[in-house]
C-alpha cells in the first residue's frame, strides 16, 4: 500500500497495460473475422433450407388440392352422365313419342343402323326374354355345353342344355342360313337327324318329314361288300398304322352297327356320347354341321335357375357383309362374273345394284345373280 501511495502513476499504468496485454494474448483479429463469416454463412444456409422446405410443402399442398378438385369434378361429371342416361330415352326405338302417336322407323334407316353398328368377334350371351308363366326352379341337374360348327368348320353357336331336355329342343334353336334360303324358295324341309355314336336320331314330328337315315341304312344292308370296302378306305391311315405297330397285324374291319331312334322322345341323358368327339347334324337334305359336346358338369347356384330358359344360346357377333359400292347398307345380292364389279364375287344392296346395272330400262344382267342371306 505504501508503495502504491508513493508511486501511484506507475501502478496505474501497469493496471492499464495488463488488460490490453491479456486481450492481445488471447484474441486474433483474423480468426475472429473468419469465425464471424462462418457464423453468418451457416445462418444463411439454414435460412435457405427452411425456405426451400416451406416452398416444397406449399407445392405439395397445392398439388394435392388440385388433384382433389379434379377428382371431385370427375365424380360430378360421371354422376351427371349417369343421370342423363337414366333420363334420356330414344324415341325412335319406342312405340310412342311424346305426342302419343305411334312412331315407326323407316326400314331404310333401320337397315343403316344395323349396318353401322360396331361388331366384333366376341361371343355374347343371349339372355332369354321375359318368360311368361310359372318359374320352374332348376334342381341339381346335368348341364352340357354343345358347340355347333358349319361346313367350313367355323363355330357358329354354343348352347348350354340340360340333361333332361329333348334333342328336338336343341335342333329347334340351331340357326342356319340354308333354312332361310329354302323357306324363301318354298322348299323348306322339316326333316333332320343327329348322328351320335352310330345312332341316327331322326326328327319325324312333322307328318311331311322324311327319314333321312333310311336310304343310308338300306345301302348298308343291301350293299355290304361295297360298304365294307369304303369303310376300309375311311379307316386306312393313322389308325391302321397304330394297330400294326401295337398288334403286329390289323384286325378285320367290321361295319358299325347303325340303328335309329326318334329325336322327339330322346333326352340328352339317354344317349351315349364322348366328351370332345365330333358328331353330325344334317338338315335340308344335305346341309351338314358338326356338333361337339365340349363339357359336362353339374349345375351350381350361379347358373340360370329357370329351367324354361334352357337351352341358353351363345352367339358370336358377326361381321355383316356390306354393299361393295356404298359401303353402308347391308348386301342383299351377290353377283358372279360381273364385268362392272371390281371383285368376283361382288355384293350389292338393292339401290346400288339397280343404279349400276340399269340405264333407264330393264336390268342388264347377263351373269348369275343370287339373293344374299347373311349367316
Swiss-Prot record:
One of its GO terms (biological process) is auxin polar transport. One of its GO terms (cellular component) is nucleus. The keyword DNA-binding applies. Residues 1-42 are annotated as: Disordered. Keywords: Activator, Auxin signaling pathway, Cell cycle, Developmental protein, DNA-binding, Nucleus, Transcription, Transcription regulation. It is found in: Nucleus. Induction: Transiently induced by auxin (2,4-D), with a synergistic action of auxin and cytokinin on transcript levels. Expressed in seedlings, apical meristems, developing leaves, roots, stipules and flowers. Disruption phenotype: Lethal. Part of the SNAPc complex. Belongs to the SNAPC3/SRD2 family. PANTHER family: SNRNA-ACTIVATING PROTEIN COMPLEX SUBUNIT 3 (PTHR13421:SF16). Transcription activator of small-nuclear RNA genes (snRNA), which have essential roles in pre-mRNA splicing and rRNA processing. Essential protein involved in the establishment of apical meristems and organ primordia, embryogenesis, cell differentiation and cell proliferation, probably by modulating the establishment of auxin gradients. This is snRNA-activating protein complex subunit.
Amino acid at each position: 500500500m505504501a508503495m502504491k501511495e508513493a508511486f501511484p502513476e506507475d501502478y496505474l499504468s501497469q493496471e492499464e497495460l495488463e488488460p490490453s496485454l491479456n486481450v492481445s494474448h488471447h484474441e486474433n483479429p483474423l480468426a475472429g473475422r473468419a469465425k464471424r463469416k462462418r457464423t453468418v454463412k451457416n445462418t444463411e444456409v439454414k435460412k435457405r433450407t427452411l425456405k426451400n422446405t416451406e416452398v416444397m410443402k406449399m407445392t405439395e399442398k397445392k398439388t394435392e388440392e388440385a388433384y382433389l378438385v379434379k377428382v371431385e369434378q370427375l365424380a360430378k361429371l360421371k354422376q351427371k352422365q349417369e343421370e342423363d342416361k337414366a333420363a334420356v330415352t330414344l324415341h325412335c326405338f319406342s312405340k310412342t313419342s311424346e305426342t302419343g302417336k305411334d312412331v315407326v322407323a323407316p326400314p331404310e334407316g333401320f337397315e343403316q343402323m344395323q349396318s353401322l353398328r360396331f361388331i366384333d368377334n366376341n361371343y355374347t350371351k343371349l339372355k332369354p326374354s321375359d318368360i311368361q308363366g310359372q318359374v320352374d326352379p332348376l334342381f341339381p341337374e346335368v348341364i352340357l355345353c354343345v358347340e355347333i360348327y358349319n361346313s367350313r368348320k367355323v363355330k357358329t353357336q354354343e348352347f348350354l342344355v340340360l340333361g333332361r331336355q329333348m334333342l328336338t329342343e336343341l335342333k329347334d334353336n340351331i340357326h342356319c342360313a340354308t333354312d332361310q334360303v329354302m323357306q324363301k324358295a318354298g322348299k323348306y324341309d322339316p326333316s333332320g337327324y343327329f348322328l351320335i355314336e352310330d345312332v341316327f336320331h331322326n326328327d319325324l314330328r312333322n307328318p311331311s318329314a322324311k327319314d333321312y337315315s333310311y336310304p343310308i341304312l338300306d345301302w348298308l344292308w343291301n350293299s355290304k361288300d361295297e360298304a365294307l370296302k369304303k369303310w376300309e378306305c375311311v379307316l386306312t391311315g393313322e389308325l391302321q398304322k397304330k394297330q400294326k405297330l401295337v398288334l403286329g397285324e390289323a384286325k378285320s374291319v367290321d361295319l358299325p352297327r347303325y340303328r335309329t331312334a326318334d329325336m322327339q322322345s330322346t333326352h340328352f341323358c339317354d344317349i351315349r356320347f364322348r366328351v370332345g368327339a365330333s358328331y353330325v347334324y344334317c338338315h335340308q337334305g344335305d346341309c351338314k354341321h358338326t356338333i361337339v359336346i365340349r363339357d359336362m358338369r353339374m349345375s351350381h347356384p350361379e347358373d340360370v335357375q329357370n329351367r324354361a330358359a334352357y337351352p341358353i344360346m351363345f352367339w358370336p357377333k358377326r361381321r355383316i357383309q356390306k354393299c361393295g359400292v356404298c359401303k353402308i347398307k347391308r348386301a342383299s345380292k351377290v353377283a358372279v362374273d360381273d364385268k362392272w364389279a371390281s371383285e368376283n364375287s361382288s355384293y350389292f344392296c338393292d339401290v346400288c345394284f339397280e343404279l349400276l346395272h340399269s340405264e333407264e330400262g330393264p336390268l342388264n344382267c347377263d351373269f348369275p345373280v343370287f339373293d344374299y342371306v347373311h349367316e
